[in-house]
Regions:
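Extended, subdomain-level signal for the structured scaffold at the beginning of enzyme domains
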Residues: 1-83
Length: 84
C-alpha cells in the first residue's frame, strides 16, 4: 500500500478509541495523519472521553486521554490530502 496523507478532524470529548486507535493504526501502516481541531493549534490537546455501559439504562462517561494535535486547523488545505 502506498503512503497517503490523511486529515483527521477531531474535537474536545471525542470518543477516546474512535480517535486514538485509527490515528495510531494509520500511522503504523505508513500513512501521514494530520490531526486538527477548529480553534486549536499543533501541540494543543483535545480531551477524550470513554463511554462505558455499567448496568444503568445509558452509558457513563469517564475522562480519557489528552490527544495531542499535530497540525494547525487554520492553515489546513483539504486539497492537500488523499483522505478525510
Amino acid at each position: 500500500m502506498s503512503s497517503k496523507r490523511i486529515l483527521m478532524i477531531t474535537g474536545d470529548f471525542t470518543e477516546d478509541y474512535e480517535t486514538m486507535v485509527p490515528f495510531q493504526a494509520l500511522m503504523a501502516v505508513g500513512h501521514q495523519v494530520d490531526a486538527v481541531c477548529p480553534g486549536k493549534a499543533s501541540g494543543d490537546t483535545v480531551a477524550t472521553a470513554i463511554h462505558d455501559f455499567e448496568g444503568d439504562q445509558t452509558y457513563s462517561e469517564k475522562p480519557g486521554h489528552r490527544f495531542a494535535l499535530n497540525a494547525d486547523f487554520a492553515s489546513t488545505n483539504p486539497a492537500d490530502y488523499d483522505a478525510l
